[in-house]
Amino acid sequence: MADPAGTDGEGTGCNGWFYVEAVIDRQTGDNISEDENEDSSDTGEDMVDFIDNCNVYNNQAEAETAQALFHAQEAEEHAEAVQVLKRKYVGSPLSDISSCVDYNISPRLKAICIENNSKTAKRRLFELPDSGYGNTEVETQQMVQVEEQQTTLSCNGSDGTHSERENETPTRNILQVLKTSNGKAAMLGKFKELYGVSFMELIRPFQSNKSTCTDWCVAAFGVTGTVAEGFKTLLQPYCLYCHLQSLACSWGMVMLMLVRFKCAKNRITIEKLLEKLLCISTNCMLIQPPKLRSTAAALYWYRTGMSNISDVYGETPEWIERQTVLQHSFNDTTFDLSQMVQWAYDNDVMDDSEIAYKYAQLADSDSNACAFLKSNSQAKIVKDCGTMCRHYKRAEKRQMSMGQWIKSRCDKVSDEGDWRDIVKFLRYQQIEFVSFLSALKLFLKGVPKKNCILIHGAPNTGKSYFGMSLISFLQGCIISYANSKSHFWLQPLADAKIGMLDDATTPCWHYIDNYLRNALDGNPVSIDVKHKALMQLKCPPLLITSNINAGKDDRWPYLHSRLVVFTFPNPFPFDKNGNPVYELSDKNWKSFFSRTWCRLNLHEEEDKENDGDSFSTFKCVSGQNIRTL
């Protein structure tokens, strides 16, 4: 038989192991190497690291690390998902405290029960919606068990949730509040809890973020203590007055400030400024202007400003002093309409809207204007003031002669102009200056047949520009043939010293030829005035511009003797910048009338005797000084 595979004995045959025994030749007294331990036995430990397995271990470690990292990430994602799903099931701290009291109560006290603890089911105000899978009842029972378990653990002190809440920072608390459905209501509630006054009692709300105001009331939440201390100094360069209060709570420092800035700002600008100075989000701020006419709000700022809880910088706003300082309460007076009428008369303010707006702006310095704002019938007061002012101005104008009126208009213009621009323009239009002065002299005096001047010419020759500049200086009236269908289109002539009809066309000349011949003559005419009987008056001097020379047109022969015609043949000149070469402004007309005063024969007998004003200053109030606030 053949030999079996393998070997029969150890080390037998040609393929066996060779046993080699080392022979150490050592004699007594030879030195033994420090690396050798003669007494130790050969255990084979020196052969442990004979084979290098580092690469195997490193690969295994990397695989285990990646698996652990993936497991940690998955666990974190699952925890967040569970937290989102069970957020509404977390019990509030107040319920935990009440449960602790119930669990720690003594058996005797617990046996005493006033309420009837019925075990029957009650109707729920907020029922859980059915998921559609029929597991709503099971989920509700599990939720109750979880809440009871959390309550028990929080009462026994063995759960870590309570310790985590104690370690929460103020910033984390305020962020949790802002994540709620109504963060503004939470901040308003915290403000009232700390300061004992509602924030809405101190402010008047602005709906728009673009509305500007100089005074602003701000409540800031979640401010750190160091920032609150430094903010007192950082805010001063931006404001004229600041009133700062700060109280600490679980949210951090809650600051209340009343600030008057150096210029008017809107809410967006203030949010950006305070976000940079306080290092908090704009969602942590309540920014509104203060109540300016609330005595209670003014007293709050006044009293807290004197206490040690406030830091005040700058001069106290006048609206606080007006409602708190005793002297200002003595100066409060009743409204006097005559003072308002006198103010409107002196400032030539006769439009109702302008009277209301400008007089309200004087409330900070005029006690009568302040009383006007406190009145409940401001609209009626404004209407009465405008009506009386127009009556006084109308009567004053009627008593003045044309020379007195031109002198009063010259006194209204403060600048000094150049009369030569008007003369150069007339020469440019080929009009003799002497003939124009003669016609203007008779025109201003209202001499019959010379009471109307017609400026005729081609388009773009400066007819309307010349006439409008003269009417603007003399504060005349403008009538338009477009309103001729109305019975009252000539009514402005009743209160004017001079009138103008611009761009008369063929239908307009037909109307003048049929109905206004007496008006062109300068004779008394009857004019229909709204809400009054027919008014008889002498028609004021009338200046007409037209492209039609009605003074020579055969269609209107009866107007030839009633019109003084001047023709403008040349186009109006402009410089390379588009500005008029000849400036026809109020100051140049003032210089023109001052220069030609004697040539126009505007002097009167009483003016020669007395160079002063013939009319004294009008007064509708008794002489007294206006008391300022």
Swiss-Prot record:
SUPFAM superfamilies cross-referenced by the UniProt entry: Origin of replication-binding domain, RBD-like (SSF55464), P-loop containing nucleoside triphosphate hydrolases (SSF52540)
Binding residue positions for ATP: 457-464
GO biological process: DNA replication
UniProt keyword list: ATP-binding, DNA replication, DNA-binding, Early protein, Helicase, Host nucleus, Hydrolase, Isomerase, Isopeptide bond, Nucleotide-binding, Phosphoprotein, Ubl conjugation
Record's keyword annotation contains Phosphoprotein: yes
PROSITE patterns: SF3_HELICASE_1
Short motif Nuclear localization signal, span: 86-88
Pfam families associated with the record: PPV_E1_C, PPV_E1_DBD, PPV_E1_N
Annotated ranges, domain SF3 helicase: 431-581
GO MF terms, alphabetically ordered: ATP binding; ATP hydrolysis activity; DNA binding; DNA helicase activity
Chain positions covered by the region annotation DNA-binding region: 166-332
Coiled-coil region: none
Enzyme Commission numbers on file: 5.6.2.4
Gene Ontology cellular-component annotations: host cell nucleus
Modified residues (Phosphoserine): 92, 106
Annotated motif Nuclear export signal, positions: 105-114
Post-translational modification: Phosphorylated.
Protein's UniProt keywords contain Secreted: no
Stored InterPro entries: Helicase_SF3_DNA-vir, P-loop_NTPase, PPV_DNA_helicase_E1_C, PPV_DNA_helicase_E1_N, PPV_E1_DBD, PPV_E1_DBD_sf, Rep_E1_papillomaV, Znf_lg_T-Ag_D1_dom_sf
Localization per Swiss-Prot or TrEMBL: Host nucleus
Covalent cross-link Glycyl lysine isopeptide (Lys-Gly) (interchain with G-Cter in SUMO), where: 538
Assembly and oligomerization: Can form hexamers. Interacts with E2 protein; this interaction increases E1 DNA binding specificity. Interacts with host DNA polymerase subunit POLA2. Interacts with host single stranded DNA-binding protein RPA1. Interacts with host TOP1; this interaction stimulates the enzymatic activity of TOP1.
Protein family: Belongs to the papillomaviridae E1 protein family.
Function summary: ATP-dependent DNA 3'-5' helicase required for initiation of viral DNA replication. It forms a complex with the viral E2 protein. The E1-E2 complex binds to the replication origin which contains binding sites for both proteins. During the initial step, a dimer of E1 interacts with a dimer of protein E2 leading to a complex that binds the viral origin of replication with high specificity. Then, a second dimer of E1 displaces the E2 dimer in an ATP-dependent manner to form the E1 tetramer.
UniProt name for this protein: Replication protein E1
Highest classification ranks of the organism: Viruses, Monodnaviria, Shotokuvirae, Cossaviricota, Papovaviricetes
